[in-house]
C-alpha cells in the first residue's frame, strides 16, 4: 500500500490502482499521476449527471443530494479518448497542441477557459482544430468540497 500525506495528515492509503483511479481528494488526484487528473468545475444537474460549460456528462455517482450544487468532475487523461461513434458524454474542444511522447500522444485541448489533457494511442489520428472527446461515465470521479463522493 501507498500512503499519501498532506500537511502532516494521511489523506489516503491504498494500492497504486486505488490511488490512481479513485483518489479520495482532489489533492491526491492532482498529486498522483502525470499529467495530473483533469478537474473541471461543474454543476450537479440530475441524479448522476454534471454540466461542464454546456456539456452534460453522465457519471456513475449518485448526485441526488447535490442537485444544482457546484462540484468538480475528475477524470484521468488516460481515460479521455477522441470520440468514435459515441453519442453521449462528449466534450467539444479546440485542439491546442499534440505532443508525440513515443509510446503515446499527449493532447492538450481547450473548451472555453478549461484545459483538458488526454493521453491517446500514438497511432490515433488527431484532428487539427476541433475534436470531440469522450468521457466514460465509469471513470469519472465527482468531488464536493474537494472530497470524493
What annotation goes with each model-predicted range?
Residues 1, 19, 98-101:
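Beta-strand-rich soluble domains of envelope-associated proteins
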Residues 17-21, 29:
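Short acidic-hydrophobic catalytic motif
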Residues 4-5, 75:
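Catalytic metal- and UDP-sugar-binding loop of GT-A-like glycosyltransferases, i.e.
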Residues 1, 13-14, 22:
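Short, glycine/charged-rich "phosphate-handling" switch motifs in NTP-dependent
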Residues 35-39, 45-149:
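Non-catalytic connector elements of ABC transporters
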Residues 32:
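A small-molecule sensor/coupling module
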Amino acid at each position: 500500500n501507498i500512503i499519501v500525506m498532506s500537511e502532516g495528515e494521511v489523506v489516503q492509503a491504498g494500492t497504486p490502482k486505488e490511488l490512481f483511479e479513485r483518489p479520495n481528494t482532489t489533492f491526491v488526484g492532482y498529486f498522483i499521476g502525470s499529467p495530473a487528473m483533469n478537474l473541471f468545475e461543474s454543476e450537479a444537474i440530475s441524479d448522476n449527471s454534471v454540466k461542464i460549460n454546456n456539456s452534460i456528462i453522465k457519471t456513475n455517482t449518485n448526485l441526488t443530494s447535490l442537485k444544482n450544487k457546484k462540484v468538480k468532475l475528475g477524470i484521468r487523461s488516460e481515460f479521455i479518448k477522441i470520440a468514435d461513434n459515441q453519442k453521449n458524454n462528449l466534450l467539444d474542444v479546440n485542439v491546442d497542441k499534440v505532443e508525440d511522447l513515443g509510446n503515446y500522444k499527449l493532447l492538450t485541448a481547450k473548451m472555453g477557459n478549461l484545459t483538458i489533457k488526454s493521453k491517446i494511442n500514438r497511432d490515433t489520428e488527431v484532428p487539427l482544430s476541433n475534436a470531440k472527446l469522450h468521457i466514460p461515465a465509469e471513470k469519472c470521479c465527482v468531488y464536493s468540497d474537494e472530497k470524493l463522493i
